[in-house]
Amino acid sequence: MSDATKKVALITGGNKGIGLETARQLGALGITVLVGARDLKRGEAAAAELKREGIDARALKLDVVDDGDRKAAAEAIGREFGRLDILVNNAGIATEDMSANSTLTTSEETLRKIFETNFFAVVALTGSMLPLLRKSAAGRIVNLSSILGSLTLHATPGSPIYGAKMFAYDASKTALNAYTIHLAHALKDTKIKVNSAHPGWVKTELGGAGAPMEIVDGAKTSVRLATLADDGPTGGYFHMGDTLPW
């Protein structure tokens, strides 16, 4: 069993981009970070990079859409640590072109593929990890959403996203926000806090090189929500210090 005084965080999709930077920033706070990665070798490379920076990092084979991986990850964390303090549901995919409204052209296959990773896998993995999170003195769940999941902003002419419509991706993040609200309510009598984070438009594989934000800033909202004090919010939707409309 590892040091019982150190917090333990699992970051899905933690081997690159915002996930890796989230692991880096949490690790810099003295938190043990578990780098969840679909490809174990890439996860190990990311963990090795963090270790060179003095961070207690471990790689964990975790394809979020694989039920066997989800169960094995929960069992491994339980054996090694006996609990989980922080779950950052960071892994996500997008396959649509933001330059055109895809509502009339998105295939059922695309809808199912995106929802499988961005919504169903999050629900399933969180369910697998909840028994471990309940053993934490202050469990925190962060669902990496997007401003593109805001129905209010999508429906408001002149909003920052009114002209940006990626139907499957946007809908998957709206569904994820609904899960955040419902899970926070279900856990309202516990010490676990659940929130949705919008990282911003960040220079990643998903965001593209033309995005205005650097990765170091894109991780800040997730890190803040992962380390909330006992009097912090739950069931919210945030970017940096701002609350976003559902």
Identify the residue ranges that each predicted region occupies.
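Structural signature of the Rossmann-like NAD(P)-dependent dehydrogenase/reductase core
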Residues: 11-12, 89-90, 140-146, 193-198
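Conserved mid-core alpha-helix of short-chain dehydrogenase/reductase
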Residues: 69-72, 113, 121-128
